[in-house]
């Protein structure tokens, strides 16, 4: 299925401002307090946000370079057999997959959306075609320019990984007046109750506080890869958490092929003659052999043990 972009009468800055200046619908599936918090902090950092968006635009490249770039990304996402995978020995640097951390936002329909941006300067909307398949999003642009009696053809494109949770039947694409192609689509059935949005960490998950566990416990601290009967894979992470940390004090998020866990809590007591403050914090990072589908992450804390599960995708 091909998607053809339409023209937007606004530039990227105006479009971004409209996203955070409208009244969020009461039927929003993302918890409203989180939506308002995300919107307020986004308003405060709007200028920096726009600068970063322009800096991180995907560029279109000649087809050969495009294929090589996607092949490089897919190698970065290649699976490693669980028995050969040792997270403590792995080391990764920021790469092309890091865009996934910031690729989720609340849409005007109150749902979680996957959204990416491309630089399409010098191309018209009718010269651009977008296709989505099982594991990637492909943008192609082609035009011919008359040069005397001859015609020169320019063909460029870009492929990026597309999470399986993205609703491929509702992908929309628009081009702003400053030549930015915006592609977005809702996410299928994300874990709305646990979602936490922030400009700093992007999409994060807050562990649930449950009386009875929904996730299996293996009593083996650390991260491992579990393969289901249908061949799909997911991470299973168990981590002991100090009793001082409530579920609301802990956040889990993914960036590229790493999963991060951050907990912070504190209290301040004041009397007439003295004051006392207490601050506790921990930070953990785990490398995964593939990329985590962050919108489908589940996490819970019971009796000081946190369990996290999230599907992987290639």
UniProtKB/Swiss-Prot annotation:
SUPFAM superfamilies: HSP20-like chaperones (SSF49764). It is found in: Cytoplasm. GO terms for cellular component: cytoplasm; nucleus. GO terms for molecular function: unfolded protein binding. InterPro entries: A-crystallin/Hsp20_dom (IPR002068), Alpha-crystallin/sHSP_animal (IPR001436), HSP20-like_chaperone (IPR008978), Tsp36_N (IPR049356), Tsp36_N_sf (IPR049357). The keyword Chaperone applies. PROSITE patterns: SHSP (PS01031). Keywords: Chaperone, Cytoplasm, Repeat. Residues 95-200, 216-314 form the sHSP domain. It comes from the Eukaryota. It holds the Pfam family Tsp36_N. Transmembrane segments: none annotated. One of its GO terms (biological process) is protein refolding. Homodimer and homotetramer. Belongs to the small heat shock protein (HSP20) family. Not precipitated by antisera from cattle infected with T.saginata, suggesting that the protein is not accessible to the host immune system. Has chaperone activity towards unfolded proteins (in vitro). This is Small heat shock protein p36. It comes from Taenia saginata. The lineage of its organism: Eukaryota, Metazoa, Spiralia, Lophotrochozoa, Platyhelminthes.
């Amino acid at each position: 299925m091909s998607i053809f972009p339409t023209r937007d009468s606004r530039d990227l800055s105006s479009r971004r401002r409209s996203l955070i200046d409208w009244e969020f619908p009461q039927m929003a599936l993302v918890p409203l307090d989180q939506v308002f918090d995300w919107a307020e902090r986004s308003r405060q950092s709007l200028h920096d946000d726009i600068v970063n968006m322009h800096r991180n635009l995907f560029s279109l490249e000649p087809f050969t370079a495009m294929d090589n770039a996607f092949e490089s990304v897919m190698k970065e996402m290649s699976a490693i057999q669980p028995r050969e995978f040792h997270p403590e020995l792995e080391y990764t640097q920021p790469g092309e997959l890091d865009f996934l951390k910031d690729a989720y936002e609340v849409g005007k329909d109150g749902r979680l959306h996957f959204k990416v941006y491309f630089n399409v300067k010098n191309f018209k909307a009718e010269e651009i075609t977008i296709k989505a398949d099982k594991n990637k999003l492909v943008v192609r642009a082609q035009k011919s320019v008359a040069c005397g009696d001859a015609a020169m053809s320019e063909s460029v494109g870009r492929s990026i990984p597309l999470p399986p949770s993205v609703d491929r039947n509702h992908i929309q694409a628009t081009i702003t007046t400053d030549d930015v192609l915006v592609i977005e689509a809702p996410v299928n059935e994300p874990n709305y109750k646990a979602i936490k949005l922030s400009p700093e960490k992007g999409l994060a998950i807050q562990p649930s506080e449950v009386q009875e566990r929904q996730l299996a416990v293996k009593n083996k601290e650390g991260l491992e890869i579990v393969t289901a009967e249908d061949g799909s894979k997911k991470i299973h992470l168990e981590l002991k958490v100090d009793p001082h940390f409530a579920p609301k004090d802990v956040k889990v998020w993914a960036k590229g092929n790493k999963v991060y866990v951050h907990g912070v809590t504190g209290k301040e007591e004041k009397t007439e003659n003295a004051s006392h403050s207490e601050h506790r914090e921990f930070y953990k990072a785990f490398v995964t052999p593939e990329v985590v589908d962050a919108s489908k992450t589940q996490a819970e804390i019971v009796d000081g043990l946190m369990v996290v599960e999230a599907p992987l995708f290639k």
